[in-house]
Amino acid sequence: VVNFSAFETFYSDRRPFFAENNNLFDVSDYMHRIINTRRIGGRPDYDCSIYGELEEYCRQNKSETSEIDFALKYTQKGEIDFGFMSASERDEKFSKGRDFYALRLNTKSDNLQYGYLGTYVDKPLTDESAQVNSIDFLYLPSEIHRMDGNFMHSKVKDKDGFGLTAGYGYTPSKNFYSGIGIKYYDERLDLNDMGYLILNDRFMFNGRTQFKRTSFQ
């Protein structure tokens, strides 16, 4: 599949280590994901201009993937669910591997679930780092009402970015659903070093009502 649009297409990770037992780290909706594990082992960072006479050779020998030296994931369920993820890429001839870290905390209290997810990426080739912090919640006051939200902050190249999503859903029966939501991503919000954001500098308001009728012979 070739994507000719101006927006990056999200593809889920099929590598077993990253795909399995990963629900604790899943803070996302269709516009963004705080963690996109396909970034780990992805296209390396390059700056071929620093290699002088080898600059053209560097440009012609860029790799599309990075080798992974190691990856670690630990989760623990309890009153406070805890998760930690770390991975380090291997250095190659014209690039230096990045280091990825993620920390997840999540807890429940009656009908309220809330948590924190933070990521940090160290990029030694460019001597830069990327940090994202997010707070998410899910509130279920009754069987038919649902409220959720995600507040995000990024710090990339010393620039702070902010975003939030919030939604309300009403499901009085299995055949009817109605909901509204808002999304705000400012022009400096950048999740893409370890996450996914289809586009920033957007404010969106959306609503949906659905009626479903099913009959069986």
Name the predicted role of every residue range:
Residues 1-217:
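Outer-membrane beta-barrel channel domains
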